[in-house]
Amino acid sequence: MRITLPSGTSASIDTSVTSPSMGLVIAPDIFSLRPLFDDMVARLAREWNMAVCAVEPFPGRRLDADIAPRFAAVPSLDDSLHLRDLHEAADALGTERVGLMGFCMGGMYCFKSAISPRFSRIASFYGMIRIPADWQSPTQEEPLALLARGDASKVLAIIGAKDPYTPPADVAALRDTGCNVVEYSEAEHGFAHDSQRPSHRAADAEDAFTRTREWLLGATTSAP
């Protein structure tokens, strides 16, 4: 079901589970909230027994499926406003504990969200560890800096070893923050969340989502 958050940002939500184990906010990839994420919200709510909400990363903008204008729009995004939307999505779930999971650009925002105590556990799928040069702006702070200021130990990073957005030196820097890193040796960027991508690897994707579920649910057994 689509809703509008208090900020005016669109989101997709499923709170149909009677007694959810926790809440889960999803930060989509650069191609925005779309049927892929509507389906993911419903599926994870059902299969993971969670209340789930995915948030539009480009609120109030009309961007087509072409990637070029989306890349061009990223520098105008504001970290504080994006985190506000993630918090509002968490509030909409009505659960005591809330986790965060994101993909690609959304995975980058997962790293940045380590500064927020609102999320008990975080899982970043192939998020950019350093902001690409074309995305840099005064409103985009470096993920590594925010991880250093926040709680990197609550973050799980799912990384493809052949992903050009997460080169080995960046992954080493990510590990140095205390972030928990799982690498898939043959995987490229975007290998897990969209089965239509050429880079999709079904076995690695299944393993990554299993690890992520276990990681997120670990928050429900940890001390507050």
Regions found by a protein language model. Give the residues of each.
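Serine-hydrolase catalytic machinery in alpha/beta-hydrolase-like enzymes
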Residues: 1-95, 191-193
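Short beta-strand immediately N-terminal to the catalytic nucleophile in serine-hydrolase-like folds
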Residues: 100-102, 125, 158
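Gly/Ala-rich beta-loop-alpha elbow adjacent to hydrolase catalytic centers
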Residues: 102-106, 110
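A conserved short beta-strand
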Residues: 118-133
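Conserved serine/cysteine hydrolase catalytic core
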Residues: 136-153, 210, 214-216, 221-224
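Short beta-strand/loop motif that positions the catalytic acidic residue
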Residues: 150-151, 157-159, 163, 184
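Conserved alpha/beta-hydrolase "acid-adjacent" motif
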Residues: 164-173
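C-terminal catalytic histidine-bearing segment of alpha/beta-hydrolase fold enzymes
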Residues: 176-224
